[in-house]
Amino acid sequence: MNILIRITEVIMVSFVLTMMTSCHWDDTIYHHYYSVNDPWLQHEVVIFELPVFEKGGPYSVEVDVRYSKSFPYHDLWLLVQHNVEDSATWKIDTIKCSLFNAAGYSSGDGLVGIFQLTTPFTTSLTPDGSSCARFKVKHCMSDSLLRGITDVGIRVKQ
């Protein structure tokens, strides 16, 4: 009888631990990708219209890039504009996405020649909560025709 109780306890503890480790709280409040033309022209802007955020924060923002081995450089430079903190004011910044390391291997995750890399943009975004916000993303590479980029995405986390 004592062994039966012990086995039941072990099974229950195992069950509870399994349930606790399988639960995952995802703090993403916005995540979306847009496909870009190949080649991606320098004047083409990808626009993300985000829902109204609750006032406060801070929120963190990441830029996701999907790319192929045909991308001719190690790094991708992006120009990112947003009006999250004040809908009438646009903030502009550049972000460096290191797609390949010095040995030529992809820095992102992926299979079959398509990779994805997430690069932090900011960790201290505090929206005013009054209107929807926008992000605008375009490449600022010296080549006006950029090959090998398939998608660009924005992820906002609380």
Regions found by a protein language model. Give the residues of each.
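Bacterial signal peptide processing site
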Residues: H24-D27
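An anionic, turn-rich surface loop/hairpin at beta-sheet edges
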Residues: I95-T126
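Post-signal-peptide N-terminal segment of Sec-exported extracytoplasmic proteins
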Residues: V45-Y73
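Exposed low-complexity, polar/acidic, P/S/T/G-rich flexible segments that act as propeptides
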Residues: L78-N83, S142-Q158
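Short acidic/polar inter-strand loop motif in beta-rich domains
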Residues: Y67-S70, F115-L125, H139-I149
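Noncatalytic modules at the cell exterior or secretory-pathway interfaces
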Residues: K55-V63, T123-M141
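C-terminal motif of bacterial Sec signal peptides marking the signal peptidase cleavage site
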Residues: M19-S22
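Bacterial N-terminal signal peptides that target proteins for export
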Residues: M1-M12
